[in-house]
């Protein structure tokens, strides 16, 4: 299995980006064993890591900046990046990441909210995997257990802009939300928005107040999942993060 890491980070002279993760091939969370990424311009950093799928099907990882072999900066890691992987040894995951800064309202990510006030005691299962997949991930902590995050867009698989038919996201890693869409059913370019969905009433109650999100054809391979992540969705006037 290949994990293909991609991240933009403008480094200074002498700095490098490394990735550290929960599996042997990514350093077993030991800072001295973080794996360097490669770059040709000091901005776009990449790494293809050949790994064995862990027994629990979960890979957690984070990005770090190193200078002279020392970890000088770490992205916000209170909620580690979490990837649920399939057991397919030939699977490729292309991880299109951005650096995670400290969220403006960090307190929403504390246990007082995620495990009490806005707790999700009965979590969904991990997102269903597809042979050719588009995995969309987003952080949205201000959503209570009666609601969930969804995605609606210009594709039948995303509801054809009918919010009540939106694809709903998993809270398996709450307050991060994830869903993997069958990319073979998408006709690019793709346009979509996040929606807030009331599970009890079975209807959408709010759209994100932003322009449509747009994705040109990313040329996803036959046995590849492209993962894109959004950090800290903006707050909607209802109080939910949208």
Where are the regions a protein language model picked out?
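Aromatic-rich carbohydrate-binding modules that target alpha-glucans
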Residues: 10-56, 66-87, 142-187, 197-220
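Intrinsically disordered, low-complexity glycine/proline-rich and charged
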Residues: 98-108
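Low-complexity, Pro/Ser/Thr- and charge-rich linker/hinge segments at domain boundaries
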Residues: 85-97, 217-228
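Ser/Thr- (and often Asn-) enriched beta-sheet segments in non-cytosolic proteins
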Residues: 2-6, 46-50, 92, 135-137, ...
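Conserved small/polar residues in nucleotide/adenosyl-binding loops
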Residues: 231-238
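Basic K/R-rich, polyanion-interacting modules in nucleoproteins and related proteins
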Residues: 1-9, 107-142
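Exposed beta-strand face motif in extracellular beta-rich ectodomains
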Residues: 57-61, 188-192
């Amino acid at each position: 299995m290949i994990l293909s890491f991609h991240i933009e980070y403008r480094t200074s002279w002498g700095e490098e980006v490394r990735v550290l993760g929960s599996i042997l091939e990514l350093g077993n969370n030991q800072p001295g064993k973080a794996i360097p990424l490669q770059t040709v311009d000091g901005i776009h950093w990449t790494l293809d890591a050949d790994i064995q799928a862990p027994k629990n099907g979960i890979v957690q990882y984070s990005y770090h900046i190193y200078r002279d072999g020392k970890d000088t900066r770490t992205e916000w890691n209170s909620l580690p990046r979490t990837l649920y992987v399939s057991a397919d040894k030939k699977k490729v995951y292309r991880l299109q990441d951005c650096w995670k800064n400290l969220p403006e309202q960090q307190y929403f990510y504390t246990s007082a909210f995620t495990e009490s006030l806005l707790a999700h005691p009965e979590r969904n299962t991990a997102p269903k995997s597809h042979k050719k997949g588009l995995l969309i991930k987003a952080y949205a902590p201000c959503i209570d257990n009666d609601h969930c995050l969804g995605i609606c867009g210009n594709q039948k698989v995303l509801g054809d802009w009918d919010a009540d038919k939106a694809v709903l996201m998993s809270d398996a890693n709450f307050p991060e939300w994830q869903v993997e869409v069958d990319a073979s059913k998408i006709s690019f370019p793709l346009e979509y928005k996040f929606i807030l969905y009331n599970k009890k009433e079975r209807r959408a109650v709010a759209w994100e107040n932003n322009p449509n999100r747009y994705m040109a054809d990313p040329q996803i391979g036959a046995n590849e999942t492209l993962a894109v992540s959004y950090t800290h969705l903006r707050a909607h006037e209802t109080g939910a993060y949208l």
